[in-house]
Amino acid sequence: MWFEEDFIELASLFYNKGLCDYIYLICGPDKSHIAKKIIDDSKKQYFIDCSNKDLQGVILAIKNSDFYIGNNSGPLNLSAALGIKTFGLIANDPVSELKYSNIKPITPEGYVDNIWIRDRMGMKKLKPNYVFNQIQKNLSS
């Protein structure tokens, strides 16, 4: 799972470039503390906490999005299935498991596929500016 401060920095890059007006934070109720931390730490009003939404509410939020960025999770796969441009932040999972999906994986430089590393620190290799540039390239193509 990517770190909250990295999501905050990435969101700031998109917002400051005028590429979004608001950002849905999609997670389950058990991860609501993460959405709250992002909102509290950022002190920004453009975040919308969706942790209390049911599946229909999550689908509505995703369908109202121009694109989706997230960890390798259920909502990431749901976004791709709904036909939304979907970018997966992958550093600790095999990206090859996404080969039949519409998810565009963003991996750190030097990434090695087919290795499971269950250490969250591996996600620190994905820097917000790098992720932003990768997504921006894909959005413009």
Predicted regions and their residues:
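Short, solvent-exposed loop/turn segments at secondary-structure boundaries
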Residues: 1-3, 118-119
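Donor-binding and catalytic core of enzymes assembling or modifying cell-surface/extracellular glycoconjugates
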Residues: 4-91
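Nucleotide-sugar donor-binding patch of glycosyltransferase catalytic domains
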Residues: 77-141
